[in-house]
Amino acid sequence: MSTSPAARPTSNAHLLGWVDEMAKLCKPDRVYWCDGSEAEKKRLTDDAVAAKVLIPLDQQKWPGCHYHHSNSSDVARVEHLTFICTPTKEQAGPTNNWMEPKEAYRKLGAIFDGSMKGRTMYVVPYVMGPSTSPFAKVGIEITDSVYVALNMGIMARMGKVALDRLGDSDEFNRGLHSVADCNPERRFICHFPQDNTIWSVGSGYGGNALLGKKCLALRIASYLAKNEGWLAEHMLILEAESPTGEKQYVAAAFPSACGKTNFAMMIPPAAFPGWKIRTVGDDISWMRVGEDGRLWAVNPENGYFGVAPGTNRKTNPNAMDSVRKDTIFTNVARTPDGDIWWEGMDHEAPAELIDWKGQPWKKGSTEKAAHPNSRFTAPAKNNPAISPLVDDPKGVPISAIIFGGRRSTTVPLVLEAFNWTHGVYLGSTMGSETTAAATGQVGVVRRDPMAMLPFIGYDCGSYLQHWLDMQSRIPNPPKIFLVNWFRKSAEGKFLWPGYGDNMRVLKWMLDRAAGRAPAKETLLGYTPGDSGLDLHGLDVSKDAIAAATQIDLGEWEQELESQSEWFEKLGKTLPRPLALQRELLLERVRAARKVK
């Protein structure tokens, strides 16, 4: 194994000792410390191209862009192989897979043993959050994947900046990753919250291998946030500027493939001249209480790891601009001359493609050319609508928190919670139909509290209690809303146009947060009523709007029955105030049905 003293760019004894220990376990041929420089990026990219890990795209059309296709069994997060390794099973809770920490270290240690023979061990220091922010957390990821090292260079503030922030401290996340033999039978993603450690083996896929993303920024961070009195959430952060120059900020939690990136990069419709939406973040929000008693948020990431299929100039022009240069595309389809394509792109598929498995594909094939969970990794700075406050160490003040799932029935277009506790109840009972972003059945409704079900690093009931406890810490809390862009007619057609027209719902929420919009009180919460939404210039029938905003009492009685099953699953740590909210709503629904 080769590494020279000059190649060790730190004197931090805690870090050096840990890296040596991991090298002894994994037995790489050489150890390389990443510095995050442009020169290094070029060198590692050249190495990846030489090793056929990356394929350069047409540099005229896609400057600085490359293509990667993963092992065909390694295309999504694997929730059944993702473990929370706490001292007791109760600390992990009923919604997480649990493994006893010593057993996990032993089991994975046997797979890591010698897993990097013949390979380079990359030491990837990174900071989540603006590097000078009190929010920031340092992580070190050790990996044998140059693809992972290059992706981390896009997704986080990577290299020297992280070592400078760390100094001589022992407070850093210890992340060990190896693709090993990419065997699904030997694939594990283990989180050790008490040790601030992540071990991931057997997968090169983003959510399993880019350890700063879901693993640190959500699973480990949610545990740290509970202990330290803040929130680590699966939320976009957007900036809305009105024609008068007023800026407001919202955080919104949607499960994977429910339009989070599209909402964060929304372009307001022509009927809203002068409005501007800018992106602070598209996926993760870390929120702390500021000196002014408001909730302030930063985006811990530095790039976008977005779903490609369905992204086009109509649905998300800012995302299309964000991927035009210096982007890594994974598991989309490509042409032999270095162009790319995916389902839902602006133009039809070319006559012939190379599909995501590397096989020839002809137009008219019943197989998907791009994998449904194919991705782009793009630098945030590419986004033409990025907020100038994206690197502000203070973060941005949050006026509204929005929860939203993908429901074809039951949940109306928008609701405002009566109060914080009611808002936590709405978030805790969110449901969404499953997507391709996690392996498993597609189209089944599952409860996904705050869109965090796969990402809570400890017991779910305790997590919901932490949300309730935050109320006493936030003197000036944001308002909480529930939205549903995906309601369908009896014929299966979407009732609401979505995309840029979601601005109409956002404007009402912003006006409510500022205390200047009327609302109608219903048994579910406050709604815009018949005249609250600005619908001018919208080509949608009154009947469709009425159906999208309707509250069907029969559906809600069924919904509350289903919520009861969900709450029973959470067991004895379910906060009593949330059970009470369900009981009170059930009484209101039954009373209203009797009146009818």
From Swiss-Prot:
Mn(2+) binds at K214, H234, D283. It is found in: Cytoplasm. Keywords: Cytoplasm, Decarboxylase, Gluconeogenesis, GTP-binding, Lyase, Manganese, Metal-binding, Nucleotide-binding. The keyword Protein biosynthesis does not apply. GO terms for cellular component: cytosol. GO terms for biological process: cellular response to glucose stimulus; gluconeogenesis; glycerol biosynthetic process from pyruvate; oxaloacetate metabolic process; propionate catabolic process; response to lipid; response to starvation. It comes from the Bacteria. InterPro entries: PEP_carboxykin_GTP_CS, PEP_carboxykinase_C, PEP_carboxykinase_GTP, PEP_carboxykinase_GTP_C, PEP_carboxykinase_GTP_N, PEP_carboxykinase_N. The active site is at C258. GTP binds at A257, C258, G259, K260, T261, N262, R375, R406, Y499, G500, D501, N502. Monomer. Catalyzes the conversion of oxaloacetate (OAA) to phosphoenolpyruvate (PEP), the rate-limiting step in the metabolic pathway that produces glucose from lactate and other precursors derived from the citric acid cycle. Belongs to the phosphoenolpyruvate carboxykinase [GTP] family. This is Phosphoenolpyruvate carboxykinase [GTP]. It comes from Anaeromyxobacter dehalogenans (strain 2CP-1 / ATCC BAA-258).
